[in-house]
Every structure is written in structure tokens, then in C-alpha cells.
Amino acid sequence: VSELVDKLFGVHDALEGASLPHAFGGAIALAYCVEEPRGTRDLDVNIFCDASDAATALAALPDGIEVADADVVAVERDGQKRLFWDGVPIDVFMNNLPLHEAVSGAVVWVQLEGRQIPVLDCASLAVFKALFGRTKDWADLEAIAVATPEDIETAVHTLAELVGEDDPAYERLVSVAASRPP
């Protein structure tokens, strides 16, 4: 088992022990949405409680994760913050939009190294990736469109409701959906 998977299990066990609903996103969730997963060196974890509860949620993380008072303030303000655990980036996301409530209800449980873990469903992951809009996100979205085109279609509809059909992220996701091979 790799260091990253050990840390993932540590985060999962800590949050589950604190009865905090959560799911892993990023490349971990992506691995269950595409035909050819890509590597990663960080963990993305969505903790499904209001960002105003950041102090409680961040205190529940494993002891090795460095959390300063300024990190709590950042999560309360922005709904997200990159933390570190022995040099491994742990990107924490908390609820600060109505979308997060819907996402929490769509979490799927998958097998990883003989254990069950919660991950974002592919359509929700696609919405977040379109909103982030980094180059690697668009490559990931193209891969999702090939493997599970229905999830890209769902993401297109969700994104239209969130940002409108004149938003560049929406327009680009429509293009990804339209250009997938048959």
C-alpha cells in the first residue's frame, strides 16, 4: 500500500470516526470514472458540512495534518484550503454552495486496496472539474466523456443551472460532450 493510500485511509477513518460525511474527489474519484486513470500526489476530500463548522471538521483530521488558525479562517471564508501531511497535499473542501448538498447525496462507495471508500460520483466530479477549469481538468473531462458520456451530459445540465449557458465553462463542457467519439 502506498503512502498516499495510507494517508487516504487515515483521513477516511478519522472523518468516519467523527461521524463527518465525506468523499474523496480529484484523481482518486477520477480513477473510477475513466478507462485509464492518471497518477496523483495529493488527496482531495470533500467534508459535507457547512464551512462555518470548519474548526470542528479540521480538528477531526488525523494529527499529522498541519492545521493553523489561519487555515480554519480560510475554509470558513472560501470553503476550501490546501493542508499538508508530511509533505503530502490534502485539499479540503467544505459546503459553501447549495450544490454541495446534492453532491453529498450522490456519493458512491468503491473498493480500494480491499476497503470501501466514499468518492464523488462522476457527474459531480465533472462539474467541479469544469468549474476549476485547469488544463488537466479538461483532459480529465475528455476521458470521462469517453468512459461515461451520460455523466458528462448530467454535468452539462447541472452546470447550466449553476452558471448559465453563456458561461465559458458551460460552453466548453458542451463542446467536450459533443466531441466524444461514438
For every predicted segment, state its role.
Residues 1-182:
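Compositionally biased terminal segments of proteins
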